[in-house]
Curated annotation (Swiss-Prot):
Highest classification ranks of the organism: Bacteria, Bacillati, Bacillota, Bacilli, Bacillales
Gene that specifies this protein: rpsN
UniProt GO molecular function: rRNA binding; structural constituent of ribosome
Cross-referenced HAMAP family: Ribosomal_uS14_1 (MF_00537)
Gene Ontology terms describing biological process: translation
Organism: Listeria monocytogenes serovar 1/2a (strain ATCC BAA-679 / EGD-e)
Pfam families attached to this UniProt entry: Ribosomal_S14 (PF00253)
Quaternary structure note: Part of the 30S ribosomal subunit. Contacts proteins S3 and S10.
GO cellular component, one term: small ribosomal subunit
Family as reported in the entry's similarity comment: Belongs to the universal ribosomal protein uS14 family.
Function text: Binds 16S rRNA, required for the assembly of 30S particles and may also be responsible for determining the conformation of the 16S rRNA at the A site.
Entry protein name: Small ribosomal subunit protein uS14A
NCBIfam families associated with the record: PRK08881.1
PROSITE patterns, per database record: RIBOSOMAL_S14
Gene3D superfamilies in alphabetical order: 30s Ribosomal Protein S14, Chain N
Amino acid sequence: MAKKSKVAKHERQQALVEQYAELRRTLKAEGRYDELRKLPRDSSPSRLHNRCELTGRPHGYMRKFGMSRIRFRELAHQGQLPGVKKASW
């Protein structure tokens, strides 16, 4: 489990990215880079790092499922992920 402060920070960053997304898009399209530079740093989507939705773990993130490899494995073994089964060849 990730620290609660890190998970909270990630949620704040996501909210900022969503809040400034439209403004950022228009400023980029119009080439107004001075105004773009004055926006908060955390409003840039490239500063976001993917985190597991269940545990907040930042490493081993599986984009297709939105969770870390560890939680994915646990849930797959329990049969709680529809359409996922253990490979056999």
